[in-house]
Amino acid sequence: MVIGVFPAAKLGILAIKQVSKPIANVIKSNAKSSPFFRKYICMPPAQFYNWVEVKTKMWALNMGGRVNVPPLNEAMAIELGANLLGEFIIFSIGAGLLIFEYSRQTIKENKKNELAQSEKMELTNMLTEMNFRLERQDAQIREMTRVLADLDSRNIFRWHKEPIQEYVPFDPDTPDQSASARNPKKFDSLYDPQGGMAFRALHFLDTQIFVDGRNRKAKEALQHLDEVAVQLEQSLGEAATVAVASSLPTKAADL
């Protein structure tokens, strides 16, 4: 059973989200007791929020116009400002965690893409190198075949059965790359009539001399079978005649 990597980063993000509200409550309570926070941090946002809320409600009720919005008293402004500060802190922590997680996933995905790209480039380089090696080997084999054919043409004694064929590069569409598949046999004898002098002589003996002997032996065997059949038929006829002749006197005596 394969166990995945423990998601420590996601667990840490979840823990920070859970403690964000208590942190906001602590900051909110400290802001209420601090004169600086009450005057410059809590009250201005609270008064602005109250003004926007009243204007929005008046516009929704079709009661807009030049309406003076009464400001909140100090206690209400401090309370509303502290609540807004706490909500802003919770929102900031959540947004920061979201941005952090997005950045982490983006970096991880980029690394994965870079790794896949590097593997693809490595495979491409390997295939290119293999193709280059195959082309070089094809050229070397073609040159060796040419040299062998040249040497074979200069030799008066040709001991091989078939002439050296021209080198053909490998074709993936043709699984059988043997010489017999590329150059099928076009003669009935065991010896190539286009080969050397010895092969031509053997071909002549096999197709012109020995074939007459084989035919003569076959004719003699057929004639012998015909003679045996004739003798067997004559023997059967004589046996039948003797049997009939021997049965006639016995019948005459009975009468």
Curated annotation (Swiss-Prot):
Domain of life: Eukaryota
Keyword vocabulary terms for this entry: Coiled coil
Pfam annotation, one family: OPA3
BP GO terms, sorted: regulation of lipid metabolic process
InterPro entries, per database record: OPA3-like
Region spans: Disordered: 168-187
GO CC annotation: mitochondrion
Coiled-coil region(s): 108-154, 212-241
Stated family: Belongs to the OPA3 family.
Protein name: Putative OPA3-like protein CG13603
Species annotation: Drosophila melanogaster
